[in-house]
């Protein structure tokens, strides 16, 4: 699931134009340039039929987008929301943006602030036996 999610974000032209390779699971490396994305798996839910596991992994992923300017944070947020809103692909049965939160933190940015938007995205992955 981790590789699938990151690769989808890296392959999207709008997201890649804003974030480049700055998409990381759990934590960003020290001194990473802004804007950047940090992904966290919040939860995973399985569903079953009378015949067993339905083969779909329902992953709630928090995507935190950080930027040194408010405009950069909004641009990244819009691109990532557009990507995940209703996405269906070969490995993804569906993706849905559920919550969006904006915060501001103290940092060494141009105005002394670090802008963050947190997106909660439900990503339903088609599980295979080789994952």
State where each predicted segment sits:
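Solvent-exposed, well-ordered amphipathic alpha-helical segments
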Residues: 41-42, 60, 100-101
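Acidic-leaning, charged glycine-interspersed low-complexity segments
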Residues: 82-131
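Oligomerization/assembly interface segments of phage tail-like spikes and tubes
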Residues: 55-69, 73, 80, 115-126
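Small/polar-rich, solvent-exposed N-terminal microdomains that initiate assembly or binding
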Residues: 1-53, 71, 75, 89-93, ...
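Short, solvent-exposed beta-strand/turn "edge" segments of beta-rich domains on protein surfaces
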Residues: 50-56, 108-112
